[in-house]
Amino acid sequence: MILKRISILNYKNLEQVEIGFSAKLNCFFGQNGMGKTNLLDAVYFLSFCKSSGNPIDSQNIRHEQDFFVIQGFYEAEDGTPEEIYCGMKRRSKKQFKRNKKEYSRFSDHIGFLPLVMVSPADSELIAGGSDERRRFMDVVISQYDKEYLEALIRYNKALAQRNTLLKSEFPVEEELFLVWEEMMAQAGEIVFRKREAFIEEFIPIFQSFYSFISQDKEQVGLSYDSHARDASLLEVLKQSRERDKIMGFSLRGIHKDELNMLLGDFPIKKEGSQGQNKTYLVALKLAQFDFLKRTGQTVPLLLLDDIFDKLDASRVCLLYTSPS
């Protein structure tokens, strides 16, 4: 998919922007605060129906304005034109349209415009909690597997309902817990299997990119841990129920999965230098791009935001050639 042109009104600090793009490589230069990252974020919004940095849509409206609009004009590999529209007014629901037809569910759009973004915020994949690493898996898999996305949505809805019951000040029938636990188990098993299969296929691609950028200086890896690996997820949830009641939330399930990021045999969070961490993250995202290119129906868009900081000159030179 090629982004031919974008039109932006009142998005973050961008008052009015109209830009046409080259079909291959586009570079943006400017001082800090001019809106380069916000321009990339607007492109991201058109793929994921949300900002990469601020999930509260109304806060992405430019100060002292009442709305924002983002329109993207694309061209598919067969030459078919595609127009994506997003509009948001304060105190109103967000609208998302493809070729002037509004989506009834935003999830129906996910994967239509596959996209990978490399940015300074990626450092949270290493430094942050396990939720950041689960989100990485979710973002990749959801862009090529609708069954995964639907199962993840069902699981999260059931999880929210179970957590509500766990917080109840009044006695709750065990059968009611079982309803949501069965839904969590059914959807969670799908999520687990697909995460496991993804990681198995993804690891050699990631290692290849890291090896290329680092010139074989280090070995890296990924390992995936889940409560669903060694036992029935339904039994895990039932056995954890009494403890969960005390805590007021669900302690076990695929929402607690962990993706371990390794430098050699040790967590890169503890062992990696700034340069190694940056190389690891860039290789991870370039592998994501390559994986989606192989797996999906169209070539993803690749957004690179300030990626050369903390890399030595030799790795920067190698990185220039990697996307090609």
Language model features with spans:
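Conserved NTPase motor "head" modules and their coupling/switch loops across ABC/AAA+ ATPases, GTPases
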Residues: M1-Q31, V172-Q186, I190-L303, K310-L318
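Non-catalytic, surface-exposed connector residues within folded enzymatic/regulatory domains
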Residues: G33, S51-N54, E64, A127, ...
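Nucleotide-state sensing region of NTPase/ATPase domains
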Residues: S47-E132, D138-Y144, Y148, I203-S208, ...
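An accessory alpha-helical subdomain
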Residues: E124-I213
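Conserved lysine of the Walker
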Residues: K36
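Helix-to-loop junction immediately C-terminal to a conserved catalytic motif
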Residues: Y44
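Conserved small/polar residues in nucleotide/adenosyl-binding loops
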Residues: Y320-S324
